[in-house]
Amino acid sequence: MLERSMNISDFDPELFDAIAKETARQEDHIELIASENYCSPRVLEAQGSQLTNKYAEGYPGKRYYGGCEHVDVVEQLAIDRANELFGSDYANVQPHAGSQANAAVFLALLNAGDTVLGMSLAHGGHLTHGSHVNFSGKLYNAIQYGLDETTGEIDYAQVEALALEHKPKMIIGGFSAYSGIVDWAKLREIADKIGAYFFVDMAHVAGLIAAGIYPSPVPHAHVVTTTTHKTLAGPRGGLIISACGDEAIYKKLNSAVFPGGQGGPLCHVIAAKAVAFKEALQPEFKVYQTQVVKNAQAMVAVMQERGYKIVSDKTENHLFLLDLINKDITGKDADAALGNAHITVNKNSVPNDPRSPFVTSGLRIGSPAITRRGFKEAESKELAGWICDVLDNINDESVQAQVREKVKAICAKLPVYA
């Protein structure tokens, strides 16, 4: 007999302690990892529901199991809301993660060994855009483009030259560490010149796009994928959308997700996605996303005043890359020092980085999580100053201790969950 009174704390105190400590860490530390965010209690409620008990292989109205009439409603709500949010006419809400969504696109549109052209991981791309350590670089002939060394922006001339030379079957747009605005129309124009598919991974900026403050790739791409967390602030998961109008492509995508790459969908996560999409359709979501960009730009301004180099010299979205080569500080050391001050970032390679990916010469910093807990420009500028204080005195633990106390105070003032 399962009783509602059953709980983790009584049954598994060791696990409960780890969960409690992580909950406290999220409240007491400042989160600046660009891919992390806080989902709402409504999303948490949906994800913790009894929907997790239900198997539902297939799609709404076309299941391989009985008893799916209610999860059909849940999934259709998620599909309809995703389409409304992004202006698409096709949505698959079943991918367990962004990487699985990307894998489904490869499986649907390509054959093993086909050539793809994507952004280099070293210049701000993603593992699934052709990195040699990932399936996208192991199973496919991956060619990589990067940034213009002078401007720090995507080198579209290089993209076109590589496309004309290698004739990829698919060109990939999107990034995991790029602070500029991507010219989706230009990339589609290049793809059309060689008859290639144009696929966009908008995972990092999906929330900004949903709010209408970053250009949407949906009118330009054959297929678009995203995660549902990051700037969208939903549960961890993936999403595939399209407005290309090609039913043959839609059918291939559905088959690539199930049965091609996954079995049963995670119904509880799909419910949480539906909640998050509804939240993103509210007017206050645009206010939030606008503040996300303002906060990132405020931090950049302070760091530049303090003598720190920003890749591309600016940010036009939620993140930026701090280039520490001229400071002779490794990303690894900077990450550790800031972590000791209870400021969580991630080390990140910068263009033409002389150090290994395990050490790096940069930091990736993002503003979605701090904005979610109420930071505005004033707090963001103050925070940027604290970061510079720590980096200016990278080995001084007393400075880290001073900043840690300031972090403690502002986190108490602006809790994640009030």
Curated annotation (Swiss-Prot):
One of its GO terms (molecular function) is glycine hydroxymethyltransferase activity. Gene3D superfamilies: Aspartate Aminotransferase, domain 1, Type I PLP-dependent aspartate aminotransferase-like (Major domain). It is found in: Cytoplasm. It catalyses: (6R)-5,10-methylene-5,6,7,8-tetrahydrofolate + glycine + H2O = (6S)-5,6,7,8-tetrahydrofolate + L-serine. PROSITE patterns: SHMT. It holds the Pfam family SHMT. The keyword Transferase applies. The record marks H229 as: Plays an important role in substrate specificity. Pathway: One-carbon metabolism; tetrahydrofolate interconversion; Amino-acid biosynthesis; glycine biosynthesis; glycine from L-serine: step 1/1. Its cofactor is pyridoxal 5'-phosphate. Its EC number is 2.1.2.1. Keywords: Amino-acid biosynthesis, Cytoplasm, One-carbon metabolism, Pyridoxal phosphate, Transferase. GO terms for cellular component: cytosol. The keyword Cytoplasm applies. One of its GO terms (biological process) is glycine biosynthetic process from serine. Its main location: cytoplasm. (6S)-5,6,7,8-tetrahydrofolate binds at L121, G125, H126, L127, S356, P357, F358. CDD domains: SHMT. The modification N6-(pyridoxal phosphate)lysine is found at K230. It is an enzyme of class 2 (transferase). Catalyzes the reversible interconversion of serine and glycine with tetrahydrofolate (THF) serving as the one-carbon carrier. This reaction serves as the major source of one-carbon groups required for the biosynthesis of purines, thymidylate, methionine, and other important biomolecules. Also exhibits THF-independent aldolase activity toward beta-hydroxyamino acids, producing glycine and aldehydes, via a retro-aldol mechanism. Belongs to the SHMT family. Homodimer. This is Serine hydroxymethyltransferase. It comes from Pseudoalteromonas translucida (strain TAC 125). The gene is glyA.
